Structures are given as structure tokens and as C-alpha cells.
């Protein structure tokens, strides 16, 4: 979430439409199950934000994956997906997705059932089966199975491509970086490496050429992009509402009271210029619209001090 907020404003400079999403890991059982024999083989799933509701749900899922489901990797489960599917579009993911993995295992009916379950969660236009061709040995079998599921269920197809680098010629550079990361050499035959140089950002023409019999699957990339309309309101403060004590209906009046009490306690008999400075600082806070913020900070700082919790200086 932090990175997408950082990059989001720059998309207008390049006249591009940002699609906010995440590849998540889905636990094969429950996110709280952590028995290696059963729970190490998690599934991949792509989640894209249609709108602000979807963004909030994605943020919740991402947080829960780390705080509740972390086992080897941060994981969610289908229970969480059922509760937080609104505003999201799901894609079946790469060979590590649940549907492709069941197809590779020869369990066509299981793959079909998993796809139907996802469609039930995300809606008729909220779940897509990904056709990919990275020139990997298993690609044809997976694609044939996905096309069959599409024909029998009507779940739409979409042409996608895993992108680990920008251009095809960058494959060697990425391979070298992986060696550096894992402390291996490029001539080590047993090291982890990508099995193809097709994991780059392909043009629309290249993707269409890979699946000439399924033009609608290529067109669905545009359809999905049109369904995703997430925007951020930068420069607008979204503070929680501060609950005022009994007898106050105006935060500004309560802010004034606290400042006056604190000033009298710290500076009894202070000269006039001190009071002028207080009025100036309070005016700036009001002008910036930060009265509620200062009340909130004052509240939790006071709570900490009353309970002996150390409080550091503000920055």
C-alpha cells in the first residue's frame, strides 16, 4: 500500500492507468494451520482493486496474511476471501495457482471445482482464468485445461504473462542478480534459475500472437483495466473522529481549554509575549486544520504517562 501511494501520482505524468493489486499466497487449508506436511504448498492468486472498497479489502487481507497466516510466507485463506472479496477482481495466477496446479496433477474436476468456487466468491465478471505461454514444458497442458474449463463453465479467459524484467535481453541480468542474492555462481548447475527468457513485459501484439484463436482473451486485458477505477485523494487528511468529553460539542473549544490549562500550569505569571506566542501557535494549528490531530496525540500521550509508559519527544 505504501509503495502504490508513492508511485500513484507519477502515473498521470506518463498518461498511464495504474492498476493496484497484489499476488497473494492462499493457504491450502486454514491460514492458522502450520503443519509442514500439509501447509507448505500454498497457492498463488492475483487480486486487483476495482475501487476503494477493494483497496481497503486488499489492505486488510495483506495485513492479515502477515499477522495471522504467516508460515514460510504471508498467507490468507478462503475464509478471509469470502469476507473481503468485495471490490476485487481475481485471476487464477501462474503455474502455482490452485487451478493450474490441480490440472498439472491430473485432477481436472478438482481444478474445475476450484474455478467455480472462485467465481462464486468474486462474481461473474470478477474471476478470470489466465492463459500464459512462457515456452515452459507444462504451459500447453495447463492452457488446454483452462480452455476446457472456460468452455464448460463460461468463466472468462485472459492472456497474461509473468514479468520479472522489462525486456527479453534482461533475462541474463536477472539471472546474475539471482546468483548474487543466493550466493551462487552462474556455472552452478544445481542453483535456482528461471527456465525461460520469456518473463518480460510483452507488447499487445506479442500476446495476441501467442493465442490467435482466443482474441477475446486478449481483449479482456482491456476490459479488466476498465473495471479497475481506483483513485487516491492526496492532500486530504483522514483523521479519526475525536470523542469529546461530556459538555463539549466543539473540538476547537476543548483544544482552547487544554492549551490554556497547560499554559497556566507551565508558565504562571508569564509575560505578555508568551501569551502572544501561544495565540500565534494555536492560530497556525487551526489554520492547518490540525486541531483534531493535536487532541488525538494529547489523548494517547496522556494515557501513556498516566500508566508509566515511556514517551519520546515528537519529531
Protein language model regions, located:
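Short, well-ordered junction/capping motifs at the entry into regular secondary structure
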Residues: 1-3
Amino acid at each position: 500500500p505504501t509503495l502504490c501511494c508513492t508511485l500513484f501520482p507519477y502515473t498521470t505524468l506518463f498518461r498511464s492507468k495504474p492498476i493496484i493489486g497484489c499476488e497473494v499466497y492462499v493457504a491450502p487449508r486454514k491460514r492458522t494451520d502450520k503443519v509442514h506436511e500439509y501447509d507448505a504448498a500454498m497457492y498463488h492468486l492475483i487480486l486487483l482493486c476495482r475501487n476503494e472498497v477493494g483497496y481497503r479489502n486488499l489492505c486488510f487481507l495483506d495485513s492479515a496474511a502477515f499477522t495471522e497466516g504467516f508460515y514460510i510466507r504471508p498467507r490468507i485463506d478462503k475464509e478471509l476471501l469470502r469476507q473481503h472479496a468485495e471490490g476485487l477482481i481475481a485471476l487464477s495466477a501462474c503455474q502455482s495457482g490452485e487451478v493450474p496446479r490441480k490440472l498439472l496433477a491430473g485432477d481436472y474436476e478438482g481444478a474445475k471445482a476450484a474455478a467455480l468456487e472462485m467465481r462464486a466468491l468474486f462474481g461473474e465478471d470478477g474471476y478470470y482464468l489466465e492463459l500464459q505461454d512462457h515456452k515452459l514444458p507444462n504451459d500447453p497442458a495447463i492452457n488446454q485445461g483452462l480452455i476446457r474449463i472456460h468452455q464448460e463453465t463460461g468463466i472468462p479467459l485472459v492472456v497474461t504473462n509473468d514479468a520479472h524484467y522489462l525486456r527479453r535481453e534482461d533475462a541474463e541480468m536477472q539471472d546474475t542478480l539471482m546468483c548474487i542474492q543466493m550466493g551462487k555462481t552462474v556455472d552452478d548447475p544445481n542453483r535456482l534459475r528461471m527456465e525461460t527468457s520469456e518473463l518480460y513485459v510483452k507488447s499487445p501484439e506479442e500476446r495476441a500472437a501467442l493465442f490467435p484463436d482466443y482474441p477475446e482473451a486478449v481483449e479482456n486485458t482491456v476490459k479488466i483495466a476498465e473495471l479497475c477505477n481506483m483513485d487516491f485523494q492526496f492532500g486530504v487528511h483522514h483523521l479519526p473522529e475525536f470523542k469529546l468529553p461530556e459538555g463539549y460539542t466543539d473540538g476547537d473549544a476543548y483544544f482552547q481549554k487544554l492549551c490554556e490549562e497547560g499554559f497556566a500550569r507551565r508558565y504562571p505569571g508569564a509575560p505578555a509575549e508568551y501569551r502572544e506566542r501561544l495565540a500565534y501557535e494555536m492560530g497556525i494549528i487551526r489554520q492547518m486544520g490540525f486541531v483534531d490531530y493535536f487532541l488525538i496525540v494529547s489523548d494517547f500521550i496522556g494515557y501513556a504517562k498516566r500508566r508509566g509508559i515511556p514517551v519520546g519527544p515528537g519529531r
